[in-house]
């Protein structure tokens, strides 16, 4: 579905599934505010939430596009925002559920992940917001040798483990426990489960 916004005589177009109408309208508002005075910055990267978007000319209109995070193709720009808007929706829902909405810390597609050996080969694993910039992911079973550690960027791992999108903006020192692809609990800095 096309969502259209008129800005200073220019038509901005954003494409997304109808179920993301609220998120699409919010995204258009963000882009509109950015470009109200900056039409010379068309085709410039605009950081927002997990990633970045840009506005490109399309005929006489302007199309809002986003990097292809779903398929890990950062050099490819897509018109359909559904995948990106779903990421935004999930993080906001998690912020509300864990009562951390006003304390969420940005984490971007190029953010570092440190992953312990064998993590995704076991059923039970955890993710720890080590600091504002880094997540550490490891098996819960401490008898499994975590070495060697592997460094990745979020966009390389998150599409295969989309449950990580939900929790990526949680505050520093929060720990999330998983069974398979399901979040089992979210422990705050006082080790209180704020998920259940």
Where are these regions (language model features)?
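Acidic, proline/glycine-rich low-complexity IDRs
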Residues: 1-196
């Amino acid at each position: 579905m096309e969502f259209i916004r008129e800005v200073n005589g220019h038509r901005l177009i954003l494409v997304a599934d109808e179920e993301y109408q609220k998120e699409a309208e919010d995204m258009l508002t963000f882009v509109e505010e950015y470009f109200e005075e900056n039409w010379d910055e068309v085709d410039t990267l605009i950081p927002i939430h997990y990633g970045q978007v840009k506005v490109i000319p399309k005929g006489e209109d302007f199309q809002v596009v986003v990097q292809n995070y779903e398929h890990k193709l950062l050099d490819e720009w897509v018109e359909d925002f559904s995948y990106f808007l779903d990421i935004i929706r999930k993080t906001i829902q998690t912020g509300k559920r864990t009562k951390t909405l006003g304390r969420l810390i940005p984490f971007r597609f190029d953010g570092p992940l440190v992953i312990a050996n064998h993590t995704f080969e076991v059923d039970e694993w955890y993710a720890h917001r080590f600091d504002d910039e880094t997540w550490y992911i490891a098996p819960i079973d401490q008898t499994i040798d975590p070495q060697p550690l592997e460094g990745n960027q979020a966009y390389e791992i998150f599409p295969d483990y989309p449950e990580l999108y939900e929790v990526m903006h949680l505050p520093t020192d929060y720990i999330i426990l998983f069974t398979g692809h399901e979040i089992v609990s979210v422990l705050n800095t006082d080790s209180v489960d704020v998920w259940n």
